[in-house]
UniProtKB/Swiss-Prot annotation:
NCBIfam families: xseA. Its main location: cytoplasm. GO terms for molecular function: exodeoxyribonuclease VII activity; nucleic acid binding. This is Exodeoxyribonuclease 7 large subunit. It comes from the Bacteria. One of its GO terms (biological process) is DNA catabolic process. The lineage of its organism: Bacteria, Pseudomonadati, Campylobacterota, Epsilonproteobacteria, Campylobacterales. The keyword Coiled coil does not apply. Pfam families: Exonuc_VII_L, tRNA_anti_2. Its EC number is 3.1.11.6. It is an enzyme of class 3 (hydrolase). The gene is xseA.
Amino acid sequence: MHVLSVSEINAQIKALLEATFLQVRVQGEVSNLTIHKVSGHAYFSLKDSQSVIRCVLFKGNANRLKFALKEGQEMVVFGGISVYAPRGDYQINCFEIEPKEIGSLTLALEQLKEKLRLKGYFDEANKLPKPNFPKRVAVITSQNSAAWADMKKIASKRWPMCELVCINTLMQGEGCVQSVVESIAYADSFYDTKNAFDAIVVARGGGSMEDLYSFNDEKIADALYLAKTFSMSAIGHESDFLLSDSVADLRASTPSNAMEILLPSSDEWLQRLDGFNVKLHRSFKTLLHQKKAHLEHLAASLKRLSFENKHHLNALKLEKLTIALDNKTLEFLRLKKTLLEKISTQLSTSPFLQTKTERLNRLENALKLAYANLKLPQFGALVSKNHQAIELEALKRGDKIELSNEKARASAEILSVDRV
């Protein structure tokens, strides 16, 4: 038997395995997943309850995956066995990877839904309210589509005062996602301007799931969620439910249904207005009768007022006026008294008045002296004290006095006073 070297046996194994297992499908659970940050290659193991095999997914194939590869996923990998002869290692070089029971697109969509759910894209609290009477609506659709024709027809019938503006958009195929995103951004750019739209409706008629799948794209979801203008998603038929339907503020089953939901019916509102008019007329008549009855009651009450009651009211008014007059009189007297006291105080402290008073006193004394002189007997004398005339009965012991007449003047001191 020929003896083989290690290199020879590994080379033969490599040739045999790679030729025999050129294309294989292997099912197992993903484990030990590592994604190289620089190269972008993914390295992992595929295992079942008894065995493990290593796998590699190179960057080019990894970029084509519709979903994120994660630990614990049950996958079916398609590829070929490759052997690294220097170490005798072998692995599966994966070309494609699919979930075991669901397609890769389905798994990718479920992962995207969970991502957006955590970001609040589906929360009712983040939804904008539907405008009650839209005046201007942007419709993102193909201007040559049957959907646009149906929407215009229904809008003109239901609410003709609303202006529908078609933003021509590619609604399927390559470039659809970018076209829809740009149209949403354009319509929303008018927000808070005089040409602002009250609503943005993304509309497309029915088709295959492949045709509609663009509306499951994350970029369209982002554009709808970030729009400041109220948005509606009306894609396909009733049975078609896409990611845009969940993210938009409101979903319509079809483009026509979007107009029926968004726009009020003018016929219904005319009927409502007629009903309001009837109710208003009835309410006015009822109120008029009530007010008339109330006025009649007041008139009867006024007639029942007697002359005595009127006289009593006048007496009360007179009493109030008398009290008020008395109060005003007392107040006037108090003010006058205060004013007089102030004037008296000012006069008593006036230097001019004091000078005049002193002069008047001197004149009075001189007058008394003159008068006394007139009454003097032939041998009598005028008695004065401190240059002021004084009567004898006013003197007391110790007083120093002056005696004077026309011929002489003398000083004396009172030794005693006898009362007669």
